[in-house]
Amino acid sequence: MEFKDCFNELKKDFVNKDVSNVPNVVFEFNVKDVGVFYAKVQDGKLDIQPYNYYDNDVSFTAKFEIYKKIINGELDPIKSFFTGRLKVSGDLGKAALLQSILK
């Protein structure tokens, strides 16, 4: 799958998530063998862009299929981390915010 298609599909799934009560945070998503995008929550609004965000709070690395299942609620991100399907670097406290966004 090409990056543009991957990004658009994940963005479509992500864009309607409620972030009104989520503190400011920047997640960077490295999609293995495809590319990188970020999701930035600021002042209760979500911005998703197809670029690196070098000053991110937390960075995730996984295959496209894993992200798709996590975003759609089919796979728990914390369990994915502990089973090695999802790699996390950066602020683990802020990484946990991802789960609150996806609920």
Model regions: which residues?
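Feature captures hydrophobic
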Residues: 1-103
